[in-house]
């Protein structure tokens, strides 16, 4: 059962403040955006004796645990993912998340704890542990192991503007064999890296839950404190929402990222950039961009534009299914050896997405058709994810 303090922390109105209907409605939406409740309702009561208004909030609890399983099928094999997440641990609003991804040559595990209101300070605090192992000795001549953790906080610095600060440390071991390229052999050895990260989040969306208007601008930078390669990573995303017609939600998103060494060293394989699969649908995860032999090594830069629009008039009688279209356009380029550059090859895809809320949990499908691609890119026309709650 959710603690009352968790609900009260979402209020944008304090006791004794003049009543503001706009803030009252935003408060209701903030509670809904927690995704802890099946139903949220409010009732305003006039207290004629004290000349005040009483806001009564009624909520209906729902399961907040999730078990997620996902799989992808494409031209380059399969990827399986499984995760367990509790979004409201002990009713305190704490999020505990574990995730395991099993690929044909890589295993990644994560454990994260997020407290959105640490010690009633209105500051988010998070802690995480991560480990990964990429075994590509038989195919590409190298193997890497990486383990470490992070600690960070995020808080509202100005109205609608949040500042995040995070520190992370990782130990990495990389080994190669005779089949590895010279670039990979140069990176063989042990590494210890400590970074400090900053993120700046300007959020002018009308609501976090089912956003239909407004925009969000987000920038983050990772700066090396202790590092052998001294890589600086930048990321920027801008997304704007609009309702083109009744019940429709359309959005345009721009994402930019870069990774470069400030001391002129080669960027480590594990720090190179890959376009996130959710931003370039229709392509296999990590199988886009510069190739060293037969190994996809990522790039120093990427840029992606995403256009999406819901289709509320289709299956309008079924409240459990959301249907939408999308167009993804992106490019990834730049390597420390310019002979491998693929900056001229633009990738794009068009497709259909389906979110189906079934009795066993949310089920999502993605059908994508690549329009343009690089000569070495691997495609993935269909992907699904299945989750359940507890």
PLM features: residue spans?
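Outer-membrane beta-barrel transmembrane domain signature
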Residues: 249, 329-350
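Strand-loop-strand
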Residues: 87, 343-350, 354-358
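C-terminal soluble interaction/assembly domains
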Residues: 13-18, 342-344
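N-terminal periplasmic "start-of-domain" segments of outer-membrane beta-barrel proteins
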Residues: 1-13
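Active/binding-pocket-proximal capping segment
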Residues: 28, 74, 254-258, 322-332, ...
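Acidic, glycine-rich loop-and-beta core segments that form the ion-binding/anion-interacting portion
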Residues: 217-259
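Extracytoplasmic gating/loop element in the C-terminal half of outer-membrane beta-barrel translocons
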Residues: 53, 246-326, 334
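Gram-negative/organellar outer-membrane beta-barrel architecture
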Residues: 20-218, 231, 242, 248-250, ...
């Amino acid at each position: 059962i959710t603690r009352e303090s968790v609900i009260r922390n979402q209020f944008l109105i304090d006791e004794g403040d003049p009543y503001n209907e706009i803030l009252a409605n935003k408060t209701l939406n903030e509670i809904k955006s927690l995704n802890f409740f099946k139903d949220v309702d409010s009732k305003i009561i006039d207290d004629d004796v004290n000349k005040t208004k009483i806001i009564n909030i009624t909520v209906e609890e729902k399961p907040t645990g999730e078990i997620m399983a996902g799989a992808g099928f494409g031209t380059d094999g399969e990827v399986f993912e499984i995760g367990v997440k509790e979004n409201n641990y002990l009713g305190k609003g704490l999020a505990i998340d574990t995730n395991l991804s099993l690929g044909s040559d890589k295993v990644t595990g994560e454990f994260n704890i997020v407290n959105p209101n640490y010690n009633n300070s209105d500051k988010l605090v998070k802690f995480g542990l991560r480990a990964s192992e990429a075994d590509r000795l038989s195919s590409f001549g190298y193997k890497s192991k990486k383990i470490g953790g992070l600690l960070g906080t995020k808080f509202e610095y100005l109205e609608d503007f949040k500042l995040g600060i995070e520190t992370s440390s990782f130990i990495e071991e990389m080994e190669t064999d005779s089949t590895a390229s010279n670039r990979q052999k140069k990176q063989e050895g042990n590494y210890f890296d400590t970074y400090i990260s900053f993120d700046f989040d300007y959020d002018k969306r009308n609501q976090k839950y089912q956003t239909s208007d407004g925009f969000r601008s987000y920038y983050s930078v990772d700066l090396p404190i202790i590092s052998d390669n001294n890589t600086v990573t930048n990321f920027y995303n801008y997304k704007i929402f609009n309702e083109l017609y009744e019940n429709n939600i359309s959005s345009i998103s721009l994402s930019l990222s870069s990774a470069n060494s400030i001391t002129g060293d080669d960027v480590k394989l594990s720090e190179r950039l890959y376009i996130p699969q959710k931003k370039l649908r229709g392509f296999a995860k990590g199988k886009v961009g510069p190739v060293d032999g037969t190994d996809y090594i990522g790039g120093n830069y990427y840029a992606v534009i995403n256009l999406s629009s819901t289709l509320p008039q289709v299956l309008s009688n079924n409240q459990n299914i959301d249907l939408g279209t999308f167009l993804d356009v992106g490019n990834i380029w730049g390597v420390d050896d310019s002979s491998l550059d693929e900056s001229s090859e633009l990738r794009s895809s068009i497709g259909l997405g389906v979110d189906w809320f079934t009795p066993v949990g949310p089920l999502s499908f993605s059908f994508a058709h690549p329009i343009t691609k690089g000569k070495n890119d691997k495609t993935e026309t269909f992907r699904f994810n299945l989750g359940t709650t507890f």
